[in-house]
Regions:
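ADP-ribose/NAD+-binding catalytic cleft of ART/PARP-like enzymes
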Residues: 1-76, 162
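Low-complexity, intrinsically disordered/propeptide-like segments
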Residues: 27-30, 34-37, 116, 121, ...
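Short, surface-exposed beta-strand/loop "edge" segments at domain boundaries and coil↔beta transitions
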Residues: 48-59, 120-127, 145
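Amphipathic alpha-helical interaction segments
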Residues: 53, 60, 67, 93, ...
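Generic surface-pattern signal
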Residues: 61, 96, 100-103, 156, ...
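Low-complexity, flexible helical/coil segments
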Residues: 62, 78-83, 120-122, 149-158
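ADP-ribosyltransferase catalytic core
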Residues: 69-141
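Charged phosphate-binding loop/patch that engages nucleotide di/tri-phosphates or the phosphate backbone
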Residues: 136-162
């Protein structure tokens, strides 16, 4: 009965960026297999002191990228989801590697780590990769600014060797 309820609920819910997802689906893109998060703890990168910039998918923070990807036949629904991590350790390691490759990463994806809980009413997630990363597709009513809190500044680390 519980599985039936989840399927019924998922069919009734609309994703926050459903219009854009539908457009990509019409162009032949596909949604990945999605799962209920079941109140899992998660973390993601965020901007300290700029809540309005947090929890915005890549295609919405850079609409030109979406148009370019579509024009080049490289549209991807994943870029309408939020990148999340299953543990702070895996998120910090991922960020450290990004900082080594991209010196301005803090201004692109954030300077801090935010943590919160993802409920089944918030949306659906992809399978968690071995590096802890997964995509989270928010439902319309989801507002992670209310449930996620910044827990750590990531740019104060003194582990870079320039």
């Amino acid at each position: 009965m519980q599985a039936y309820e989840q399927i019924r609920m998922m069919k009734e819910e609309k994703f926050k960026y459903q219009k854009q997802i539908d457009m990509l689906l019409a162009l032949g893109c596909q949604l990945p297999e999605l799962f209920a998060p079941n109140d899992m703890n998660a973390c993601r990168f965020a901007f300290s002191g700029a809540d309005y910039q947090n929890h915005i998918p890549q295609y919405l923070s850079n609409p030109k990228r979406m148009l370019q990807d579509i024009n080049n036949g490289k549209g991807n629904t994943s870029l309408l989801a939020l990148s999340c991590f299953s543990t702070t350790e895996k998120a910090e390691l991922f960020y450290l590697n990004l900082r080594k490759a991209f010196k301005n990463i803090a201004s692109t994806i954030g300077d801090s780590l935010s943590e919160g809980k993802l409920s089944n009413e918030d949306g659906r997630k992809t399978k968690t990769a071995s590096n802890g990363h997964f995509d989270f597709y928010e439902y319309e009513a989801c507002d992670l600014n209310k449930t996620f809190q910044i827990t750590k500044n990531l740019i104060e680390k003194k582990d870079e060797k320039d």
